[in-house]
A protein has these predicted regions:
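Alpha-helical transmembrane segments in multi-pass membrane proteins
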Residues: 77, 134-138, 142, 146, ...
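N-terminal transmembrane-helix/juxtamembrane module of multi-pass inner/ER membrane proteins
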Residues: 2-115, 153, 180
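Alpha-helical membrane-inserting segments
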Residues: 35, 39, 89, 93, ...
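Membrane-interfacial segments
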Residues: 97-109, 153-157, 161, 211, ...
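Long, low-complexity, intrinsically disordered cytosolic termini of multi-pass membrane proteins
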Residues: 1, 275-300
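Membrane-embedded catalytic cores of phosphoryl/pyrophosphoryl-handling enzymes
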Residues: 16-17, 23-24, 171-285
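Membrane-interface interhelical connector segments
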Residues: 154-182
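Interfacial segments of alpha-helical transmembrane regions
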Residues: 104-152, 215, 219
Length: 300
């Protein structure tokens, strides 16, 4: 087979891989967003679901009155995403320590650390510097997008609206959206609590980069966790169900963008069986997003 034919096959394979990747990781979320918009935002399903948990006689959401439920599902639940972000920051800082020690490898401190557990941790941090910074940036962008949408749509929570004893009018987000300026004082769309759990999707992309065989299970667990976080707030009257879906969509898309910038599509699309041979994160460098050579290797 001549070189022109080989190159044509490589181009076809690369194009097919690219379409498959974006079809799954971008096309499916966009389709789901349209489905949520049509099913929830253009209908009264949100209110019908929320009505199930509202005591119209007492004028309250009974579960929302439980301090224990609030502590377990809202305050304590934030520990997992908060610790993940904090550990990423600590890891990113520590990733610069070992390279500094290597410059003074003849020092007493460097010799002591070389065979110690602390030295092992520092070398681990150096190897995964790119991953730590990815998690930090992914968390920052997804959180920033959620806060931007909250302030630029000014949607009030169910308990704050006249539908459930509050004083504010219930207005859908797309009727209130303002691109450049804050739309008002409402801060309920998308769901912030659910988004904190969905922010852990950054860990899925790290796992996918290393072709971890359980990455799909990790993805399912994170999505389930986000749904649980969001649903508990629905039970308390602080969110509609669609707010949780939108939070997941926004966080997924923003995290996907950061993952593409840090790792590149070809790294995120590698078959599981190539895990050991491909990724060696020894430096804080980004990989080209659509490397033809990488596509050809992963296809082979």
């Amino acid at each position: 087979m001549g070189k022109p034919q080989q190159r044509a096959i490589q181009l076809t394979t690369s194009s097919s891989a690219r379409l498959r990747f974006y079809g799954i990781n971008l096309g499916v979320p966009v389709f789901f967003a349209l489905l949520v918009f049509v099913t929830f935002d253009l209908t009264t399903i949100d209110r019908q679901l929320t009505d199930l948990f509202f005591d119209s006689t007492a004028g309250v959401f009974p579960i929302g009155q439980s301090h224990l439920f609030e502590n377990i599902t809202h305050r304590w639940a934030r520990i997992l995403p908060n610790w993940t972000g904090e550990l990423a920051i600590i890891g990113a800082v520590l990733s610069f320590v070992w390279p500094l020690l290597e410059k003074y490898d003849d020092s007493r401190l460097a010799r002591r650390l070389t065979g110690s557990r602390l030295g092992t941790c520092l070398r681990f941090a150096r190897r995964h510097r790119l991953d730590f910074f990815f998690v930090i940036v992914a968390f920052a962008l997804s959180t920033g997008m959620i806060h931007y949408l909250k302030s630029h749509t000014s949607v009030y929570c169910p308990v704050e609206t006249t539908l459930y004893g509050g004083s504010q009018a219930h207005i859908e987000w797309f009727r209130n959206f303002n691109l450049l300026h804050e739309a008002g004082a409402g801060r309920c769309w998308p769901g912030g609590h659910a988004s904190s759990a969905f922010s852990l999707l950054a860990l899925y992309f790290v796992a996918r980069r290393y072709c971890w065989q359980h990455s799909k299970i990790l993805l399912a667990v994170i999505l389930l966790l986000g749904m649980i976080y969001g649903t508990t707030r629905v039970l308390q009257g602080w969110h509609f169900m669609s707010h949780t879906f939108w939070a997941g969509i926004v966080v997924w898309l923003s995290t996907l963008l950061v993952a593409l910038c840090f790792y590149g599509r070809s790294s995120l699309q590698q078959p599981i069986r190539q895990a050991a041979a491909v990724n060696r994160p020894d430096a804080f460098v980004t990989q080209p997003a659509d490397s033809l050579a990488a596509d050809a290797r992963s296809a082979g």
